[in-house]
Amino acid sequence: MKVVVIDSGTGNLASARRGLEIAAGRAGLDAKVIASADPLDVRNADRIVLPGQGAFADCARGIAAIEGMRGAIEEGVAAGKPFLGICVGMQLMAERGLEHEGAPGFGWIKGEIAPISCPGLRLPQMGWNGLDFTSTGCVHPLLNGLQADDHAYFVHGYALRDGDQAQILATTEYGGPVVAMVASGNRAGTQFHVEKSQEVGLRILQNFMVWTPEGTSGS
């Protein structure tokens, strides 16, 4: 199995790669995990991971600046390859981001990325926070082995707004419910830094490594 962590210049590549390697080992998989900015590697991948940090528009520009990368991602997803977006990588799955000048997203999940509304609370949200699973999340294979109120590590000031409840797997509480995890078909994303979320994050990554979304043949 070949897993590609996309290097768009804005992600935490080393931690994501290491987490995936540990997860593959726990799952008993013979997996090669690489970080790459080469669209050909993405086309040849069995699983695709897109980490991202910073502003939505900057991450979108990072993808656009690599000739052929957006097309390679779309081709992989259309072919049924499992995709995982991390932090801003998840946000890019939405229709649009409103940070700074605003920018279009991939349009894979409904909603836009907007500032968190939490009067009296510090922004960005930074630290450990509990996960609340939705009815969709409770039966989703990416959350197998996890329990309600398991904690994950967040660093963000923007979040998905006006999303489709059927695409939301988990929320967290920060001045109100904030979307923490989404999925649509073979595309999934975590607003939290799954690669920094210790055992909870490793469990999700392990689930991702063995995930066979409905309608795909697996890898």
Curated annotation (Swiss-Prot):
Heterodimer of HisH and HisF. Pathway: Amino-acid biosynthesis; L-histidine biosynthesis; L-histidine from 5-phospho-alpha-D-ribose 1-diphosphate: step 5/9. This is Imidazole glycerol phosphate synthase subunit HisH. InterPro entries: Class_I_gatase-like (IPR029062), GATASE (IPR017926), Imidazole-glycPsynth_HisH (IPR010139). It comes from Granulibacter bethesdensis (strain ATCC BAA-1260 / CGDNIH1). It is found in: Cytoplasm. It catalyses: 5-[(5-phospho-1-deoxy-D-ribulos-1-ylimino)methylamino]-1-(5-phospho-beta-D-ribosyl)imidazole-4-carboxamide + L-glutamine = D-erythro-1-(imidazol-4-yl)glycerol 3-phosphate + 5-amino-1-(5-phospho-beta-D-ribosyl)imidazole-4-carboxamide + L-glutamate + H(+); L-glutamine + H2O = L-glutamate + NH4(+). GO terms for cellular component: cytoplasm. The active site is at 87 (nucleophile), 193, 195. GO terms for molecular function: glutaminase activity; imidazoleglycerol-phosphate synthase activity; lyase activity. Keywords: Amino-acid biosynthesis, Cytoplasm, Glutamine amidotransferase, Histidine biosynthesis, Hydrolase, Lyase. IGPS catalyzes the conversion of PRFAR and glutamine to IGP, AICAR and glutamate. The HisH subunit catalyzes the hydrolysis of glutamine to glutamate and ammonia as part of the synthesis of IGP and AICAR. The resulting ammonia molecule is channeled to the active site of HisF. The keyword Lyase applies. The keyword Membrane does not apply. Residues 2-218 form the Glutamine amidotransferase type-1 domain. It comes from the Bacteria. The lineage of its organism: Bacteria, Pseudomonadati, Pseudomonadota, Alphaproteobacteria, Acetobacterales. Its main location: cytoplasm. GO terms for biological process: L-histidine biosynthetic process. Gene3D superfamilies: 3.40.50.880. Its EC number is 4.3.2.10, 3.5.1.2.
